[in-house]
Amino acid sequence: MKNAFIVLFCSLLFVSCKQEIKPTDIAKLNGYWEIEKVVFEKGEEKEYKMNETFDFFQIKNNKGVRTKVMPQFDGTFLTTDTFENVSVRFAGDQVFLDYKTKYAKWSEEIISLSDDKLVVKNPQKIEYHYKKAGPVNLLNDGEKTK
């Protein structure tokens, strides 16, 4: 009986921690995202202090692309030829990003999404934690980049 109570409590705790993603939240995906850390299935974490590339999402009507971009010191971005077509899929209380290239298809579940944080989980139960990013401007004496 005690074990059943512990399992029930842990299940409720897990369910209550998950954010409900609404269709109106999807617009928050648009923009530049920098990976902060990766959390593996057994809880190990890998932190990223600095990234050479950001993910740029451009989604409209639940379809769009994710492109790898490289921030430059003058506040601009170089775009690589690497991109994935992205579709947003709502399945019950879960929301997925379905990716497709010429060579592969895969999905990631959106665990949480806010104006400045994004967490997704892949089928291998690896979580990717992102923070919203912007231009890096180390030139022009700190003038704000447009």
Name each model feature, range by range.
Residues 13-16:
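C-terminal motif of bacterial Sec signal peptides marking the signal peptidase cleavage site
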Residues 29, 56-65, 90-94, 111-117, ...:
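Short, solvent-exposed coil/turn segments at beta-strand boundaries
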Residues 83, 121-146:
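Edge beta-strand at a domain terminus
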Residues 2-8:
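Sec-dependent signal peptide recognition
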